Swiss-Prot record:
EC number: 2.8.1.10
Pathway in which this enzyme or protein is active: Cofactor biosynthesis; thiamine diphosphate biosynthesis
Domain of life according to the entry: Bacteria
Membrane-spanning ranges: none
Molecular function in Gene Ontology: thiazole synthase activity
Top-rank EC class of the record's enzyme: transferase
Upper lineage: Bacteria, Pseudomonadati, Pseudomonadota, Gammaproteobacteria, Alteromonadales
Gene3D superfamilies reported in the protein's UniProt record: Aldolase class I (3.20.20.70)
Annotated protein name in UniProt: Thiazole synthase
Organism: Shewanella putrefaciens (strain CN-32 / ATCC BAA-453)
Gene: thiG
Length: 254
């Protein structure tokens, strides 16, 4: 069981809501994934319409919403988006995203740390999206973040665990859950992330852009489960040379 702040999750697969062809496909894919935490961009919600086509089906599905501050260019804008989410959605959970560069969507470490400090002081449960930077992740822990969400590779790129070496360090040192976010493009990559010891993964583009999002969501669900079980079972040690599984020495000496 995964615990973030005071909430327990049976599923270690978190999902997003972007890039789906329509809301029905989105909901069916989320249900197939068994995800219990779903991120939604504040910039996509039309609060003037009340419960719009995005929020209504998500609430009916009974999943926990994790609003994100995607689109924020600095700490001030991110804090404003988080406070709006708390007021309009009734949640103090926030996925903190600050990426001023619209081309590569790289997170701004300085602004993210500042926003995280402010939001934690205001009582938010903060899950920051950041570079796979072990030092930064430790600093975010220290200011009170409930989890850290280091990227595997650029958002939506499907490149996989490009930052694996740094993710290993973050996982080793972390005292809060590590959710690997961004760039996971295949179930095998999600399984690998879990084998490393990640507490969860967040997947959106790989599911939403699939020719069959519902089937792909099921594949990711199973991959995450298998990867976690493999980690808990204990993977064999990687060797530089060959090691016989059935030595023949005794047989030859008879």
């Amino acid at each position: 069981m995964l615990k973030i702040a005071d909430v327990e999750f049976e599923s270690r697969l978190f999902t997003g809501t972007g890039k789906f062809s329509n809301s029905q496909v989105m909901i069916e894919a989320i249900m197939a994934s068994k995800s219990q935490l779903v991120t939604v961009a504040m910039k996509r919600i039309d609060f003037k319409m009340g419960l719009d086509d995005l929020l209504t089906p998500l609430r009916q599905a009974g999943v926990r919403l994790l609003p994100n501050t995607s689109g924020a260019r600095n700490a001030k804008e991110a804090v404003f988006a988080a406070e709006l989410a708390r007021e309009m959605l009734g949640t103090h959970w926030i996925k903190l995203e600050i990426h001023p560069d619209p081309k590569y969507l790289m997170p701004d470490a300085i602004e993210t740390l500042e926003a995280a400090r402010i939001l934690c002081e205001k009582g938010f449960i903060v899950l920051p999206y950041v570079h796979a930077d072990p030092v930064l992740c430790r600093r975010l822990e220290e200011v009170g973040c409930a989890a850290v969400m280091p990227l595997a590779s650029p958002i939506g790129s499907n490149q996989g665990l490009v930052t694996e070496s740094f993710l290993k360090i973050i996982i080793e040192q972390a005292r809060v859950p590590v959710v690997i976010d961004a760039g996971i493009g295949a179930p095998s990559q999600a399984a690998r992330a879990m084998e490393l010891g990640a507490d969860a993964v967040l997947v959106n583009t790989a599911i939403a852009s699939s020719a069959s999002p519902i089937v792909m969501a099921e594949c990711f669900k199973e991959a995450v489960q298998c990867g976690r079980r493999a980690f808990e079972a204990g993977l064999g040690r990687v060797q530089t040379g060959a090691v016989q599984t059935s030595p023949l020495t005794g047989f030859l000496n008879q």
